[in-house]
């Protein structure tokens, strides 16, 4: 998936109020950019970080830049747009790029389901096969070695989604939790139970019930982001209590 216009480099001054960030362009101009990520963004919002912005000339938009990438000190990239993984997965599903989810002719996004007023990211259907309920989560936390971790803060909504998937699996349906790692310096995946113990417990219960856990990496450059192959998921229980 290519960015619609070329990204421009900048230096981050600060990120604040969850969805705002101040940065300085290479010509010295200070601007305010939209930050499309409500999470903690641990390790990705350090003052002075080199970032990449998507400019726009839409007269309806007050902010003329959107923050998209962080260029890490070692040259790797991290994507910070929390909504992008759904678009990447939608594209990959349509092209049959996710081996574990091939063979479904109907791909319906944002379908209502469950007992807790939820919407599944993708409902996959094919005559003669059980429907597949696929939930997608964005992951860009790395703290140790080449481990990608989720979540980077408490996510009650994420735990709710795991509960809904657990119910589907227990009733004999196909339930899939798909994590998309928006970092190029990670090679495997696990949870961060110290940051959200409740999510880790819900994850263990979901996996024990038969929820399939998938993880895919991404290739990230200032030109675009694409979904890559599967990453191994830590098979051990994730909760610490």
Swiss-Prot record:
Return the Pfam families for the record: SfsA (PF03749), SfsA_N (PF17746)
Cystine pairings recorded for this chain: none
Single GO MF descriptor: DNA binding
List the InterPro entries hit by this protein, alphabetically. SfsA, SfsA_C, SfsA_N
Output the superkingdom of the source species. Bacteria
Which family, according to the similarity comment?
A: Belongs to the SfsA family.
Could you tell me what this protein is called?
Sugar fermentation stimulation protein homolog
Q: Which organism is it from?
A: Jannaschia sp. (strain CCS1)
Gene that specifies this protein:
sfsA
